[in-house]
Amino acid sequence: MSSCNFTHATFVLIGIPGLEKAHFWVGFPLLSMYVVAMFGNCIVVFIVRTERSLHAPMYLFLCMLAAIDLALSTSTMPKILALFWFDSREISFEACLTQMFFIHALSAIESTILLAMAFDRYVAICHPLRHAAVLNNTVTAQIGIVAVVRGSLFFFPLPLLIKRLAFCHSNVLSHSYCVHQDVMKLAYADTLPNVVYGLTAILLVMGVDVMFISLSYFLIIRTVLQLPSKSERAKAFGTCVSHIGVVLAFYVPLIGLSVVHRFGNSLHPIVRVVMGDIYLLLPPVINPIIYGAKTKQIRTRVLAMFKISCDKDLQAVGGK
């Protein structure tokens, strides 16, 4: 960009630095993962909404999680695929800020829902007699609203902080989509407020959530170890396995990506970009698989849907 400007910049997305010639082929596994994520999460939302036996807090939170994963992956994947297959590298300043907001806000909302699910497990195991009173459907809906408001309020300032900056030198983003850290690095201005607020928001949302999730499981483990029989302990731990898997799938890539963004300047840019793409696609892909494999009602409904579909196909073939 030849001159400084504030709000009329057009950014250019590189994709995966060093692998530009392979973008066309890289797009196919990304599309496959996106299709799996869309299909799996839509199935979860449909089954939880239509299966009355799943209208319990844990599964309502799971439905919220699936909806967030759908929104998070859809906020980036269409543009990534357009970049990889049609060389659509340009993204307007406003579109970049909008994408940035949704990526960060939806991640914060998902973190809050994971905390709520940990609280649900804590109450169910440590205070089972109070579970129905503490976490009814009304409270569950209120927690969902709080999660949306919390994530939106904490990360709404990020686009505003970017808007105050001037961009004079490069408009090239070494990434497949827009995130605060990468856009901020292109600015020709003091970015200290952006750095401080971005780090503060992450610590106050994800940091606090991780702390309370860890505390919940510390209390859960302490309670479970006091159970008299091995079968009771195994059953109690079994109700937490799916949630632990989902928590690890979300936070491990997120923490790794945050560390690489802030302290991995010596690493090749390809590492940061690939980790970013994995972070956006891994949870939406594996969350439905984790909960589908562990939840009998979801597993049964999915198998029944496939059986009905196969029976109809066989009848159609037989009719011919």
Curated annotation (Swiss-Prot):
Per the UniProt entry, the glycosylated residues are N5
The protein's GO terms of the molecular function aspect are: G protein-coupled receptor activity; nuclear steroid receptor activity; olfactory receptor activity; signaling receptor activity
Q: What membrane topology is given?
A: Multi-pass membrane protein
- Show the stretches that span the lipid bilayer: 25-45, 54-74, 99-119, 139-159, 196-216, 237-257, 273-293
GO BP of this protein: adenylate cyclase-activating G protein-coupled receptor signaling pathway; cell migration; cellular response to fatty acid; melanocyte differentiation; melanocyte proliferation; positive regulation of blood pressure; positive regulation of renin secretion into blood stream; steroid hormone receptor signaling pathway
Q: Explain what induces or represses this protein's expression.
A: Up-regulated in prostate cancer.
Keyword Protein transport tagged: no
Q: List the disulfide bonds in this chain.
A: C96-C178
**Does the entry feature the keyword ATP-binding, yes or no?**
no
Sorted UniProt keywords: Cell membrane, Disulfide bond, Endosome, G-protein coupled receptor, Glycoprotein, Membrane, Olfaction, Receptor, Sensory transduction, Transducer, Transmembrane, Transmembrane helix
Q: In which tissues is it expressed?
A: Highly expressed in the prostate. Also expressed in spleen, liver, olfactory epithelium, retinal pigment epithelium and medulla oblongata. In the retinal pigment epithelium expression is restricted to the pigment cells and choroid (at protein level). Expressed in epidermal melanocytes (at protein level).
Q: Where in the cell is it found?
A: Cell membrane; Early endosome membrane
Query: What domain of life?
Result: Eukaryota
Q: Where is it found, in Gene Ontology cellular component terms?
A: early endosome membrane; intracellular organelle; plasma membrane
What PROSITE patterns is this protein classified in? G_PROTEIN_RECEP_F1_1 (PS00237), G_PROTEIN_RECEP_F1_2 (PS50262)
Sorted alphabetically, which Gene3D superfamilies does this protein's record hold?
Rhodopsin 7-helix transmembrane proteins
Give the family, as the similarity comment puts it: Belongs to the G-protein coupled receptor 1 family.
What is the protein's known function?
Olfactory receptor. Activated by the odorant, beta-ionone, a synthetic terpenoid. The activity of this receptor is probably mediated by G-proteins leading to the elevation of intracellular Ca(2+), cAMP and activation of the protein kinases PKA and MAPK3/MAPK1. Stimulation of OR51E2 by beta-ionone affects melanocyte proliferation, differentiation, and melanogenesis. Activation of OR51E2 by beta-ionone increases proliferation and migration of primary retinal pigment epithelial (RPE) cells. Activated also by the short-chain fatty acids (SCFA) acetate and propionate.
This protein is called Olfactory receptor 51E2
List the top taxonomic levels of the source.
Answer: Eukaryota, Metazoa, Chordata, Craniata, Vertebrata
Which gene is annotated as encoding this protein in its UniProt record?
A: OR51E2
